[in-house]
Structure formats: C-alpha cells, structure tokens
Amino acid sequence: MATVSMRDMLKAGVHFGHQTRYWNPKMKPFIFGARNKVHIINLEKTVPMFNEALAELNKISARKGKILFVGTKRAASEAVKEAANSCDQFFVNHRWLGGMLTNWKTVRQSIKRLKDLETQSQDGTFEKLTKKEALMRTRELEKLENSLGGIKDMGGLPDALFVIDADHEHIAIKEANNLGIPVFAIVDTNSDPDGVDFVIPGNDDAIRAVSLYLGAVAATVREGRSQDLASQAEESFVEAE
C-alpha cells in the first residue's frame, strides 16, 4: 500500500506552517516549534497520521467507495483535478457551491442540465440556434462544467472527502459533517482541525507538498480499487467452477 516517508515530506516542505501570528491554538499538539516567526509542523506526528488516513482511504475504495477530492485554491486546482481523474474519482476544484452535498437534489438537476447541454453541443442543436442563443448556452455549459464537471458522474453522495486546506474548504467540511461523510484533510497551523475525522497536519500552500499528498492518495485509491476488481474476478471464477 502507498505510504509516505518523513524524507519525502521534508523534501516537499510539508513541515513549514504559517506565520506564528496566524496560528490556531487547536493545532498546538502538532507544532514542533517556530523558526523565523514561522511555525514548524512536527512530522513525527504527520507521517503516521497521513499513513493511517491512506490505509482508511484504501479500505473505502476497496469497498467501491466514492472519494471526492476538494481543493478550490488556484494553486491546488489543476493538481486536484489530475489526481481525481488518475484514480477515476471525483473533484471540486473551482468554487464550492453552498449545498453541494446537503442540497444534492438541486445539484442533481443542475447536473442533468449540464448533460443536456453537452448533448446539444455535440448533436448539432447549437448550430440550429441563433448566434446569441448559441452563445448563451455555450456560456451556461462552460459555467456548469466549471462548477459541476468533476462530480457529474458521481451518481449520488460521496463516501469520503479528501480536502486540501481545511480552513479554505470549511463549508464543504461542515456539509460532510452534517451528512456523516468522513473527512480527510490537510490541516495547516492556521486552521481549525474540528470537524476533520482524519487530520493530516501539513503545509497546504506549497505545490510540492500538495502534489505529494494528492499523488499518495490517488495511488492508494487505485490500489484499493484493484483489490476490489481482483476479489470480483475471484468470485466470478469460483461461481464458474
């Protein structure tokens, strides 16, 4: 199973927190100290906590669970999309729309509209419209694709959230809490760990650190899914005998 070592984390700068004046006292147990007015995260805590989170995500994906990757900050946006796509999972990487989980019924209607517009753009419907109407629908399609493209094939609520930056994505975390969906999150020294089921104390800004987390999670999910496929194949083999 995918694991991450302390050396990997040091190289990626996972240990660099935020400036000391911005700290959240609830993160005190995970802080090693401060250097040049920047908090240093205790990687002796982070390494086992991250590997424990990976083990749990592996189990969820082995049970065919759906993982929703959430990271809407510009620095993380593209990496979040790539990681989710690389393991056939789902993502929100632009803006979290309030109610995305708690008001799933309405979201489902918007997804249906998105899929209808996609069909229209491909089957020649747009070409039959006036230029103005075609442009309006193209813009609507782009807007919906931006906000819902990463969850359009999710087919229901996710089984877990993997979040980059607990502070920035606090609305998503609150919605998941309300629905009892487990939250795995990167929590920096300025963030509140409450509401996060699997806290991973670490830098949430450095692109190398973000890429390290996402790469490890995607690899773990792929492994979990292949275990599931292997057990399915075994079952069908037994049935065939």
Swiss-Prot record:
Record keywords: Ribonucleoprotein, Ribosomal protein
Gene Ontology biological-process entries: translation
GO cellular component: cytosolic small ribosomal subunit
A GO molecular-function annotation: structural constituent of ribosome
PANTHER family attached to this UniProt entry: 30S RIBOSOMAL PROTEIN S2 PROKARYOTIC AND ORGANELLAR, SMALL RIBOSOMAL SUBUNIT PROTEIN US2M
Family: Belongs to the universal ribosomal protein uS2 family.
UniProt xrefs under HAMAP family: Ribosomal_uS2_B
Name recorded for this polypeptide: Small ribosomal subunit protein uS2
